[in-house]
Design a protein with these regions (language model features):
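A structural signal for isolated positions on well-ordered beta-strands in alpha/beta enzyme cores
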Residues: 7, 37, 97-99, 245
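Metal-dependent amide/peptide-bond hydrolase catalytic core
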Residues: 130-131, 139, 146-340
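Short glycine-aspartate micro-motif
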Residues: 35-37, 63, 123-127, 148
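Acidic/histidine-rich catalytic neighborhood of metal-dependent amide-processing enzymes
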Residues: 71-142, 184, 338
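Acidic/His- and Gly-rich active-site-bordering loop/insert found
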Residues: 1-66, 87, 92, 290, ...
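Short beta-strand segments
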Residues: 39-40, 99-101, 126-129, 150-152, ...
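Short Gly/Pro-enriched turn/cap motifs at secondary-structure boundaries
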Residues: 13-17, 137-141, 281-283
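Flexible, glycine/proline-enriched loop segments at strand-loop-helix junctions
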Residues: 65-72, 101, 158-166
């Protein structure tokens, strides 16, 4: 409804891959010249069956349920904001694309190329993730690099001939200390070795160990430097004769608040003031599809959904009293984009 031309792309998984939901793109032509890309995701982090265990519920001004703020609220905000403008007879927005992808929570590996293609045709990107708990919208996000290091040594009996062994766990320990030591080297850059698993028995020198590492940076330059530092630690061995394989498990470029993003944030603040509420923009360490649009050079603004919190957790909530103000905010923003 609402005049949207809808395109639906079916995911064809490779062998061993999970089947993702459809990628759905709605397009609406207005009389304005600006091309606006709105992005929301249809997937959540929760396992099948979670809704049966914890169905949608409300308590006063709060709604609870899996994905209620991340990000069913934002998805609907996009549609309702356009409905509000249509009901008001406003037809001066330009070409509007509402992009609904099914794989954001795993880093948008399938939809990213299509996001980049759409971003290449857009003057602005509005990402509909939930607003922060304090109501802030999001103008910058850290870039994220996930790396898996697979370390292989040589097994040996720890009591009989330990000298023949080459401990993958010892090498992993050295690398863990070196990686964690990168924290504080650059402003805002964090490195976390979040998963370690290796070895088989206490009396065997460990042949294998795996590290999973999370690297985050607020700026493109330090993101690249941190990536090179991780690579150097990967390639520098303390234990002789070990081999290390580095596998990239996904990445997002930083969403930096450039001139275009700052203009969008200022416009949103102005619209909110006219609607009668204060609005601030903030930086956050988590990534979203706004990292992709911003990295492609498109002025981007995020956190435009309703207020919510405890994303990914059992008490995930949405502030119902924020729904109408945030729909109004997005509608106002869409109606003013011709002016920037």
């Amino acid at each position: 409804g609402g005049g949207w031309a809808v395109e639906r792309m079916r995911h064809e998984p490779d062998q061993g891959q999970d089947q993702l939901g459809d990628l759905v793109i709605g397009r609406l032509e207005g009389s304005g010249s600006k091309r606006v890309l709105m992005i929301g995701h249809t997937d959540t982090v929760f396992d099948t069956g979670t809704v049966a265990e914890r169905p949608f519920a409300t308590d006063g001004d709060r709604a609870f349920g899996p994905g209620v703020t991340d990000m069913k609220g934002g998805l609907l905000t996009g549609f309702f904001a356009v409905e509000v403008l249509q009901a008001a007879g406003f037809e001066d927005s330009g070409r509007l694309t509402h992009f609904c992808n099914p794989d954001e929570e795993i880093g948008s590996p399938w939809s990213r190329e299509t996001i980049l293609a759409e971003a290449g045709r857009a003057d602005a990107a509005l990402v509909l993730e939930g607003a922060r708990e304090n109501g802030d919208i999001v103008s910058s996000r850290k870039g994220v690099l996930d790396v898996r290091l697979e370390i292989e040594g040589r097994a040996a009996h720890a009591g009989v001939e330990p000298e023949r062994g080459r401990s993958a766990i010892l090498e992993a320990a050295h690398k863990t200390v070196a990686l964690q030591a990168l924290n504080g080297r650059w402003p805002g850059v964090t490195v976390n070795v979040g998963v370690v698993h290796g070895g088989t028995r206490p009396n065997v020198v460990a042949e294998r160990c795996v590290l999973e590492v999370d690297v985050r940076s607020p700026q493109e330059a330090t993101f690249a430097e941190a990536g090179r530092a991780v690579e150097a630690i990967t390639n520098e061995h303390t234990v002789p004769d070990v081999t290390v394989r580095s596998i990239g498990n996904g990445w997002h470029r930083p969403m930096e608040k450039g001139e275009g993003g700052a203009k969008l944030a200022a416009l949103a603040t102005q619209v909110a003031a006219e609607l009668g509420f204060d609005l601030k923009d903030a930086a956050t360490g988590g990534a979203s599809d706004a990292n992709t649009t911003s990295g492609a050079g498109v002025p981007s603004l995020d956190g435009l959904g309703p207020i919510g919190g405890d994303d990914h957790g059992p008490r995930e909530w949405r502030d119902l009293s924020s729904v109408v103000p945030r729909i109004s905010l997005l509608a106002g923003l869409l109606s003013r984009l011709e002016g920037i």
